[in-house]
Amino acid sequence: MIQPQTRLKVADNTGAKEIMCIRVLGGSKRKFGNIGDVIVASVKSATPGGVVKKGEVVKAVIVRTKRGVRRADGSYIKFDENAAVVIKDDKQPRGTRIFGPIARELREKDKEFNKILSLAPEVL
């Protein structure tokens, strides 16, 4: 569950290291986001020479959460960290590489995230 003020690690090579959620997109009363949801975030720390700079407001898709997600067979998949991938307005990733595993639920949420899934080293 990602809500405003939650800090997430960035799982791509855009240059951002950590972002902070400003808003979960998808309705005015939306309080929490889970895997596959798009958020608006502020870059809190970044590497020099990256695509994004510190203080920049970006859109990102959540790819890993500590809370995890329940699957249809009753099992849960949880991760060690909250992580997101910085995306453009057309839902394509801004970076060229993705780090760490990505949950399969991302494919079921939106077909436009297939590029992120194809770049990921592992899909769980």
UniProtKB/Swiss-Prot annotation:
Role, per record: Binds to 23S rRNA. Forms part of two intersubunit bridges in the 70S ribosome.
Organism field: Clostridium novyi (strain NT)
Keywords: Ribonucleoprotein, Ribosomal protein, RNA-binding, rRNA-binding
Lineage of producing organism: Bacteria, Bacillati, Bacillota, Clostridia, Eubacteriales
Designated gene of the protein: rplN
Alphabetical list of Pfam families matching this protein: Ribosomal_L14
Protein name: Large ribosomal subunit protein uL14
One GO molecular-function entry: structural constituent of ribosome
Listed InterPro entries: Ribosomal_uL14, Ribosomal_uL14_bac-type, Ribosomal_uL14_CS, Ribosomal_uL14_sf
Family: Belongs to the universal ribosomal protein uL14 family.
